[in-house]
Design a protein with these regions (language model features):
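Conserved Walker A/P-loop ATP-binding site and its immediately adjacent core
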Residues: 6-18, 25-49, 126-132
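Conserved P-loop NTPase motor "coupling/switch" region that bridges the ATPase
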Residues: 27-28, 47, 87, 95, ...
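Catalytic acidic motif of RecA-like/P-loop NTPases
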Residues: 7, 73, 93-97, 124
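Conserved helix/coil segment N-terminal to the catalytic DExD/H
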Residues: 58-87, 98
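Conserved pre-motif I regulatory segment
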Residues: 1-4
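Conserved helix-turn-beta segment of the N-terminal RecA-like "Helicase ATP-binding" lobe
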Residues: 36-59, 139-143
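Conserved helicase/translocase motor-coupling segment
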Residues: 187-246
């Protein structure tokens, strides 16, 4: 699993991982991603000397291409059999965070026999234990029920409130780091990588007070006078508020 913050190059990491697996194991490889990021993958792949083709079903595959992109719906709806691929990576894999979702349950079954599986998404919150366990279940690292029993004590007063056993805390984080990479900033890779240009400067906030005349708040349909101007919910109301506050 690749858990990396925004802008750290998750797409490049996935492409290079699949390229190396393809060079060693052969076959065809696949990235499953939202439609909005497929051009980003194509651009980054070109930088690495790899050509990706976007497909929605197996019939669109060509003999001269081994690297493919598809969207989540094509796999979830059964249009594309992922078992024909040597390796598959799920970009924006946060769609798997909910155990009860159709996507998670479907993917858990159809990916069981895919030899090399990867997930890539932004770094989950450290206390989102169930989300981390769901990724482990999908990747075939450990069954979700087994992980819950092994590492956590339940709270009988509150559902889904998990607490790490104190004597299992170190073991849990070591286990997690045996299959997942966490990156919050470039310097997490070592002192040779600077955070300059990545760490944002402190946010400067300028407050502007706009005087409002509540005498023109108007009336309700029943004639009741409004105490305050109402929220600008519609286009005409928003335009009126803009004119009055410019």
């Amino acid at each position: 699993a690749i858990f990396a913050a925004f802008g750290l190059g998750k797409s490049v990491m996935q492409i290079e991982t699949l390229r190396l697996i393809h060079a060693r194991a052969g076959g065809k490889v696949l990235v499953i991603c939202p439609l909005g990021v497929r051009q980003e993958f194509r651009r980054d792949a070109q930088m690495l000397g790899v050509r990706f083709e976007f497909i929605r079903r197996e019939s669109e595959m060509t003999p001269d291409c081994d690297f493919y992109l598809t969207n989540y719906e094509s796999v979830r709806d059964g249009k594309l059999d992922v078992n024909i691929f040597t390796a598959v990576s799920l970009d924006e894999a946060s769609v798997l965070r909910s155990f009860g979702s159709d996507t998670y349950q479907t993917f858990l079954q159809v990916f069981k026999t895919v030899k090399y599986r990867f997930v890539a998404t932004a770094t989950p919150s450290p206390n989102r234990f169930k989300e981390l366990i769901h990724y482990a279940g999908f990747l075939g690292i450990m069954d979700t029920g087994q992980a819950l029993t092994r590492f956590f004590k339940r709270d009988s007063t509150k559902a889904n409130n998990l607490t790490l056993y104190p004597h299992k805390e170190r073991e849990f984080w070591l286990w997690l780091h045996s299959w997942a990479l966490f990156l919050q900033k470039p310097s997490d890779l070592g002192p040779l990588h600077s955070d300059e240009g990545y760490a944002l400067p402190p946010l400067t906030i300028h407050y502007h007070e706009v005087p409002v005349d509540h005498a023109g708040a108007g009336e309700e349909r029943d004639g009741q006078v409004r105490m305050f101007r109402d929220a600008a919910l519609g286009l005409s109301e928003a335009a009126r508020e803009k004119r009055a506050s410019m």
